[in-house]
Amino acid sequence: MKRRQFIQAGAGVSLGLAAQLAAWAQEAGVGHESATPGDHPSPTGAAQEGAQPAAAPSGVMPSGPMSKGPDDQHEAMKRVVKSIYAPTRYVFVADRFSNFISVTDIVSGEHVETLNFSMRPHVMELARDDAMLAVGSPEVSAIEFMNLRTRERRRVELPSPVFQIFFVPQTNLVAVGLRDQVGMISYKDFTVRIFPRRFDSDQRQTLINTYYSLLFSSFSQSFWVLDEDRPCIYHRYGGAEPLDAPWKTIDLSRHIGSGSGLGIGVASPEDDLLAMTTDDGSEGLLYFPAQDKVLSTGPMRTVGSTNEPMIMPYIDAYSKHVIFADVTGNVAMFDLVNGNGKPERFRVNFSPRFVRTGWLESTWILAGDKGIMFQSFKDPSDRKIVRFVPEVMNMWVTGDSKTALYTLDEGAPAIYRFDIRTREQLPPIRVRGVTMASMLRMGSNNSICY
């Protein structure tokens, strides 16, 4: 989006790789510290996730005595290089002010590694069923892949920068949204299929934004493009369809009173449901493609004008609830199972930025500027609000649905945590290697939509 906030960062180069390799060689065979008992993953399972051998980066020699031949050198490097694939333990934290991504173990609290892809990590995603990391930046016309087991990296050149990345479950495919095009990349053979149709605007004044938002249904491999200038959705399938396959236009103008174009949104894994905002922030919309049916939140913003006043909508893991909110504190929630098509309205006394759910979808979470709220789906009065001074930069819920992780824009870089079951705060985990902890990603999550 043209008003999308980008992670601001400076360039930097990772140093001390040889020293790291030497230290790893001395520690060969030593695993992570045992996880503490309780609800965390078992130490045995975590060790299996995080200790798989892999090939060393090209051109890096192991420290210690010289090997006798290439095969011996290769085996020595395999023993030295450690996998950083542990989807239930490792959190990848992007720095707001540099190129660095810190890898932190949320079980032991240890710093695992700092990664540098020589680009600002505005876009960072991990596969949920594979050991693959993808990183992009609005300033680089390329995407970087890293196999977290083997540590192999591959940069794939693209026609324009990447703004959105979606891993396709049970495949080696990634859907991407570029500056004005969308397409798919295979990280098995790194082939690129970019669809020829462009989604741009006559109003473009800079190259570091888009004038559309891509929603992607991961199971059906559906591309849903929201037009920022017009109240239209453009739809097509990826997969084996020809590059020049036609796009279907879905006109929502009769459903939007303000006549605004479309803003941001999220799609269910199949072609059942889209949740989106209008670009002017006046309302949120639910679109059901099979019935060509639209539900509206009604007016959201009350007075004034703000920059992207509505935040990203949220569809829970079971597609039962859809939640909309704006930065002024207005919240609208649809119950698609027991509701009557009308949203339940709420008002909070802080400025929301993120919506999430947890503890097996019994609780929804609203986090933002100076506050975080936990509320039961069944009982709206069962609510807890925690107030603080900083703003929440990003939020993630662990795959077991029990822990909310978030970062703040003040203080030392850290991963802050809440136990969603008790709604009590857990001790923060210090994040090394970054100036300000911002975006959070893990290889596991409690919602397929995210």
Residue ranges, per PLM feature:
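Predominantly soluble domains enriched in secretory-pathway, periplasmic, or organellar proteins
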Residues: G10, Q26-Y450
